[in-house]
Structure formats: C-alpha cells, structure tokens
C-alpha cells in the first residue's frame, strides 16, 4: 500500500531535496521559465504556488516564511514586489508545466515550467545587463 507517500524522493536526501527546491524556485522566480525534468517540475509546482500565495498576503510574516525557503533576498524581493501584485486577482494556477520531449543523453522526460502570465523579457535579463555593462566599460 502506498499510504503516506505524498511526494517524490528523487533519489536524494531530505537536505538535498530542500536545497534543490530552494535553487529551482529561485531560478524560476528570477527567469520566470526554466527547463528541467518532468518529475522535478511536477514537484516544484506546489512549492511555487504556495510561495505566490505568501506573496499575495504580503505581510512581514509571509515575507519571512518565503525567505526561509529561498536562498537569496533578491528572489524574495521579486516575489513580493512583482509576482504577488501580478497574481493578486488569480485564485491559484500560477504556473504551468509543459512537456518538452526527452533529454538526449539519458532519454529523461523533460518539461518547461513557467509562470502563466510571465514577463517574456525576464528570461536572460541578467545576461543582457551584464553584456551591456561590459560594452559600456570597453567604450569608456
């Protein structure tokens, strides 16, 4: 019987899974779309949904709860300043998981997980800013 088997272990320890979800949630918040394996994407969805719900609350306790799950303060800031207000009228269903074929090396099923009303310019924004800063430094 599979009683009390509510999540995928993904062949990792509890601490490794906790770090994995913190890193993946931060990447998804920063880029608003990431590509990963299908089981990881399916497990990440409820974690992100709960964080968006915390961001919609917007109080100090919710911010501290989100900060305890995420690794960097910039992710918490974007979560509460950008994503929370964006989804204030939506009652759940903030992210979607799209199947994306199979990985070449090991045929693992891949998926794209993204926010529903995502900002298409967010993906790669840090790289564009870094390249622009390097070009300005070379010109000066």
UniProtKB/Swiss-Prot annotation:
Lineage: superkingdom: Bacteria
- Note the subunit structure: Part of the 50S ribosomal subunit. Contacts protein L32.
Q: Which GO terms describe its biological process?
A: translation
Protein name as catalogued: Large ribosomal subunit protein bL17
Pfam families annotated for this entry? Ribosomal_L17
GO CC terms: cytosolic large ribosomal subunit
- Which terms does the record give in the GO molecular function aspect? structural constituent of ribosome
Q: Does the entry feature the keyword Manganese, yes or no? A: no
Which SUPFAM superfamilies does the record cross-reference, listed alphabetically?
Answer: Prokaryotic ribosomal protein L17 (SSF64263)
> What HAMAP family is this protein classified in?
Ribosomal_bL17
Family under the similarity heading: Belongs to the bacterial ribosomal protein bL17 family.
Keywords carried by this UniProt record: Ribonucleoprotein, Ribosomal protein
């Amino acid at each position: 019987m599979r009683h009390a088997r509510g999540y995928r272990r993904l062949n990792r320890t509890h601490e490794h899974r906790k770090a994995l979800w913190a890193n993946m949630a931060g990447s998804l918040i920063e880029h608003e779309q990431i590509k990963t394996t299908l089981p990881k994407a399916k497990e990440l969805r409820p974690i992100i949904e709960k964080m968006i719900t915390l961001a919609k609350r917007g109080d100090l306790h919710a911010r501290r709860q989100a900060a305890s799950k995420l690794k960097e303060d910039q992710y918490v800031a974007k979560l509460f300043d950008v994503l929370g207000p964006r989804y204030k009228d939506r009652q759940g269903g903030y992210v979607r998981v799209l199947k994306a074929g199979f990985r070449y090396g090991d045929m693992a099923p891949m998926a794209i997980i993204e926010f529903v009303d995502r900002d298409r310019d967010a993906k790669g924004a840090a790289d564009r800013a870094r390249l622009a800063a390097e070009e300005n430094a070379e010109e000066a």
